[in-house]
Amino acid sequence: NRIDHNEIQTPVGLANTGMEGFTMEEQKVIITIARQYGSGGKTIGQMLAEDLQIPCYSIEILRMASEDSGINEMLFNQADEKLKGIHLFSKAKGVYQGKVIPPESDGFVSNDNLFNYQAKIIREIAEKESCVFIGRCADFILKDNPNVVSVFVHAPKDYCLQRALERSSMNEKEMLRFMAKTDKYRSDYYHYYTGRNWLGFEKCVEEIKAYIKVRFS
């Protein structure tokens, strides 16, 4: 489902969703949120998690992957930053195969394996509990999970710009450049690890079908 934040007039809440009386004990639900920079997707995800009284995971995945793998968390953070600065994404690689590389292998601390460990954590959490995932290609990693609802949050450029400027010391020109760079990185990151476009035709078809199934079931 694609959400234009500019159309949201009231905070996300059970009273506005037709979910009155619904509890997470009745049905496990995993919500994945991808978002444009400045659209408020992270805030929406956090609000939704609080409203539904379920955990919300974002950057915490790096710490959990570090603890699970024994790889220093700094390497996970460095990989995120390093990937932003190189032309790694010229071609879709689709490296995610659903398994991690063992410690005795040469590629144990490679960027690809760091992603594999994040994916492992995401799958394990989704098996255990209802939750919200923000970013991290979670929608693709959990694409075969029938309990997943995937959302892409976007907003008009002027809205994203104004919201981003309120939280930064950058001027308008600098922020526009930063927003474009960040969204391109997120799109390229997703394309590289999944082989799919961030929200291409294929993804739109999947989301429409998923919504129809929920709406009329």
Stretches found by the model and what they are:
Residues S66-S130:
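ATP-dependent small-molecule kinase phosphotransfer cores
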Residues P55-S66:
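Short beta-strand-centered segment that lines the nucleotide-binding/catalytic pocket of NTP-utilizing
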Residues N1-T23:
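Short, Lys/Arg-enriched N-terminal segments with co-localized hydrophobic residues
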Residues Q27-I31:
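Pre-Walker A (Motif I) flank of P-loop NTPase domains
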Residues C56, V148-S150, E206-E207:
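Conserved beta-strand scaffold positions in the cores of enzyme catalytic domains, especially
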Residues L83-G94, N171-Y211:
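Small-molecule kinase domains that catalyze NTP-dependent phosphoryl transfer to phosphate-bearing small molecules
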Residues A119-S168:
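ATP-dependent NMP and nucleoside kinases share a basic, alpha-helical "lid"
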Residues I33-Q46:
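Glycine-rich phosphate-binding P-loop
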